[in-house]
Curated annotation (Swiss-Prot):
Source species: Listeria innocua serovar 6a (strain ATCC BAA-680 / CLIP 11262)
Localization per record: Cytoplasm, Nucleoid
InterPro entries: Chromosome_partition/occlusion, HTH_ParB/Spo0J, Nucleoid_occlusion_protein, ParB/RepB/Spo0J, ParB/Sulfiredoxin_dom, ParB/Sulfiredoxin_sf
CDD domains assigned to the protein according to its UniProt record, in alphabetical order: SPO0J_N (cd16393)
Originating gene: noc
Role description: Effects nucleoid occlusion by binding relatively nonspecifically to DNA and preventing the assembly of the division machinery in the vicinity of the nucleoid, especially under conditions that disturb the cell cycle. It helps to coordinate cell division and chromosome segregation by preventing the formation of the Z ring through the nucleoid, which would cause chromosome breakage.
Keyword Cytoplasm set for record: yes
Superkingdom of origin organism: Bacteria
Protein name per UniProt: Nucleoid occlusion protein
Similarity comment text for this entry: Belongs to the ParB family.
Protein's UniProt keywords contain Repeat: no
GO biological process terms on file: chromosome segregation; division septum assembly; positive regulation of sporulation resulting in formation of a cellular spore
Length: 284
């Protein structure tokens, strides 16, 4: 089955048709012979929802079989249905109904991503890592990936920018300690130390996004200091304006790079001025 077929499907029923293509029968497989999907983009599972599903399975059984592929003789990897698998595991049942499919790594990764996107259950970090994994495996552009998963190219790029944040910040998003908008605002800061430090302030003060952005502007020197020192006010204003201009240029360059353009950025400071050189190679 061509990998492109998976990316071309946006309707859940169409995805189910692909997963179940060529199915001959449902088997009862031993639970201890099944292991989770190595390409599962979701790393955080809602235990309450799994417990609720387990209660339903206890009464009605597993109505929809999981889908697996055989990795070694009598050992299987889950392709779809990990929540059902976890629910059955919590019930300490010995077997689970399953359908065996022959799919390669790229197809399995695509199914796992699209299935979760359709259910809107991924955190922003999980989604970003899934995009990166698919880009690495398939060697496609962000634009091509966006078309195949039904997203805009800018949405893909913005999600993947979150992976530039320190692991501590990514974990906070993953665990829903801060929102995606909080995390995105932290990208304006220049160092990881600043980002981690501000994360601590956000959590300690329970700041919303607007308050966080205001604090970032203070850090970047856009807002006037609380202190009202009047020594050399003109020089301070000019210095502040220069910082604003420099930060604006740097952020613009970063945005262009994130959108896939290859360019070189150099910065030089003299006694009289800052010199910025941007080189964009001509396409041959």
């Amino acid at each position: 089955m061509p990998f492109s077929r998976l990316f071309g499907k946006k309707d859940k029923n169409q995805m189910d048709d692909i997963v179940e293509e060529g199915v001959q029968r449902v088997l009862e497989l031993p639970m201890d012979k099944i292991f989770p999907n190595q390409f599962q983009p979701r790393t955080v599972f809602d235990q309450d929802k799994i417990d609720e599903l387990a209660r339903t399975i206890r009464i009605h059984g597993v109505i929809q079989p999981i889908v697996v592929r055989e990795m070694e003789p009598d050992y299987y990897e889950i392709i779809a249905g990990e929540r059902r698998f976890r629910a059955v595991l919590s019930l300490k049942l010995e077997k689970i109904p399953a359908i065996i499919q022959n799919l390669d790594d790229e197809e399995v990764a695509a199914i796992a991503l699209i299935e979760n996107l359709q259910r809107e259950e991924l955190t922003p970090i999980e989604e970003a890592k899934a995009y990166r994994s698919l880009l690495d495996m398939q060697d496609v552009t962000q634009e091509a990936l966006a078309q195949r998963v039904g997203k805009s190219q800018s949405a893909i790029a913005n999600k993947m920018r979150l992976l530039k944040l320190p692991e501590t910040v990514q974990e906070a998003v993953l665990n829903k300690q801060i929102s995606e908008r909080h995390a995105r605002s932290l990208l304006a800061l220049e160092t990881e130390e600043q980002q981690v430090s501000l994360l601590q302030e956000i959590e300690e003060n329970h700041w919303n996004v607007k308050q966080t952005e205001a604090r970032i502007q203070e850090i970047l020197g856009v807002k006037k200091s609380v202190a009202t020192k009047k020594t050399k006010p003109k020089r301070q204003a000019i210095s502040r304006d220069v910082r604003i201009a420099m930060n604006t240029i740097k952020q613009s360059v970063t945005m262009v790079k994130d959108n896939g353009m290859d360019l070189d950025f150099t910065e030089e400071e003299t006694d009289d001025f800052y010199q910025i050189t941007i080189q964009i190679p001509k396409k041959k």
